[in-house]
């Protein structure tokens, strides 16, 4: 009941999963938000995540500024947000906006707020209201040309809204990509470490809101959002192409990032058609295709003192709102992969990590904190069975056995901090 960001939210698909799901949800909620109350609600199988930006002042005025589609996500955490949402009828869009305003007025809310909803088969359901600006408020700013932060300050100072509902005009299309320190080829495992180089993209219609610079350390103890890449263009197709160009220009070295995943997602036919749902990334796609395309690009490669050989490359550039392909002679160095459309996932899989190399050792795939040990010496385990739960960067990761056998040794306890490669347990 308390919190957000996907924490304390568990899907239960049958009676035998209720106890474990409840225990995990309440443990996360208590750890992150200090409250462990939980509630049960209907689970929608293929919804889209649509949210409405609202504003209300102390003078009785309330408006909605359009919707954002946040359906491209993993672990209930958003990867891509865009406005307007593709495929929504004007009738549904207006109904959602008016419902969001009623929510704000019904509870006497003032200032900026985000009413989140789930949409499926022509119907929508209230999910929650975030009483603040969202990370993705930037896309609404770009399509409405309204400074929402400045408006928030004015309303907090007791001033009335500077615009009414009829003054809100939405133009063009905006897309935001959340660039996270994660390895998409390993189930979006967190990738803490030092950023050795960060170069932000530029050009018309491109905005970079970053929290790190070259040389900064990304800690395991905090959220792994490196920055937000936001683009605007007159229509959705141009916005997607502009986002792809900016992602190729963005350089983040020293850690794994979601840049290759974003390129694959933006280029996928499902995203282009707007048929994706909140389950799309985790259940329908096989992002391990990025490995063959160079999924670890962005992690700084070793270099020597010898000068790089020059090779001829075709580089996309944008000048005065127009895109060109320019042939250039550049150093023969690794570049971020184009990562074409991701392949269909052969079957749904859970977001979890495996430890060890099949020799019976269970190792930590990343730096983190052990939150729960699921086995004891003498227990029999199967291949793929969860052995421990490791928390890193606000995410719980189940560490699975890669070999069947009997647990001979458990070397850690709940609360222990471990590093990548540390042996957690031994299976014989």
Question: What are the residue ranges of the model-derived segments?
Answer:
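Short, solvent-exposed beta-strand edge segments and adjacent coil->beta transition regions
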Residues: 6-7, 224-228, 312, 325, ...
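Glycine-centered loop/turn motifs
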Residues: 214-216, 312, 415, 421
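Structured functional modules or segments
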Residues: 348-428
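ATP-dependent carboxylate activation and anion-phosphoryl transfer catalytic cores
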Residues: 1-5, 11-302, 343-347, 352
């Amino acid at each position: 009941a308390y919190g957000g960001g996907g924490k304390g939210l568990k899907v239960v698909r049958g009676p035998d999963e209720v106890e474990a799901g409840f225990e995990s949800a309440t443990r996360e909620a208590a750890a992150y938000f200090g409250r462990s109350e939980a509630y049960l609600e209907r689970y929608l199988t293929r919804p889209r995540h649509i949210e409405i930006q609202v504003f209300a002042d102390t003078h009785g005025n309330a408006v909605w500024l359009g919707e954002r589609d946040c359906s491209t996500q993993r672990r209930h955490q958003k990867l891509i947000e865009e406005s307007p949402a593709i495929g929504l009828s004007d009738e549904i869009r207006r109904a959602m906006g008016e419902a969001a305003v009623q929510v704000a007025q019904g509870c006497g809310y003032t200032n900026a707020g985000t009413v989140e909803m789930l949409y499926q088969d022509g119907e929508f359901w209230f999910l929650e209201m975030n009483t603040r600006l969202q990370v993705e408020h930037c896309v609404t700013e770009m399509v409405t040309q309204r400074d929402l932060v400045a408006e928030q300050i004015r309303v907090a100072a007791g001033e009335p809204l500077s615009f009414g509902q009829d003054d809100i005009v939405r133009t063009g299309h905006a897309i935001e990509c959340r660039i996270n320190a994660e390895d998409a080829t390993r189930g979006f495992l967190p990738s803490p470490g030092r950023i050795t180089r960060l170069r932000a993209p530029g050009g018309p219609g491109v905005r970079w809101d970053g929290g790190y610079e070259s040389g900064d350390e990304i800690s395991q103890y905090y959220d792994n959002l490196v920055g937000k890449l936001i683009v605007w263009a007159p229509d959705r197709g141009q916005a997607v192409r502009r986002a792809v160009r900016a992602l190729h220009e963005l350089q983040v070295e020293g850690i794994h990032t979601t840049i290759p995943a974003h390129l694959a997602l933006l280029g996928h036919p499902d995203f282009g058609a707007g048929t994706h749902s909140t389950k799309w990334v985790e259940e329908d796609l096989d992002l391990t295709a990025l490995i063959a395309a160079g999924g670890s690009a962005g992690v700084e490669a070793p270099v020597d003192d010898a000068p790089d050989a020059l090779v001829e490359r075709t580089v996309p550039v944008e000048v005065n709102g127009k895109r060109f392909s320019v042939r250039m002679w550049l150093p023969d160095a690794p570049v971020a992969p184009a990562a074409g459309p991701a392949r269909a996932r052969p079957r749904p899989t859970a977001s979890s990590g495996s430890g060890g190399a099949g020799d019976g050792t269970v190792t930590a795939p990343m730096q983190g904190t052990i939150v729960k040990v699921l086995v004891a010496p003498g227990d029999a385990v199967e291949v793929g069975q969860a052995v421990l739960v490791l928390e890193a960067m606000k995410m719980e990761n189940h560490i699975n056995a890669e070999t069947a056998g009997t647990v001979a040794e458990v070397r850690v306890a709940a609360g222990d901090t471990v590093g990548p490669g540390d042996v957690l347990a031994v299976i014989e």
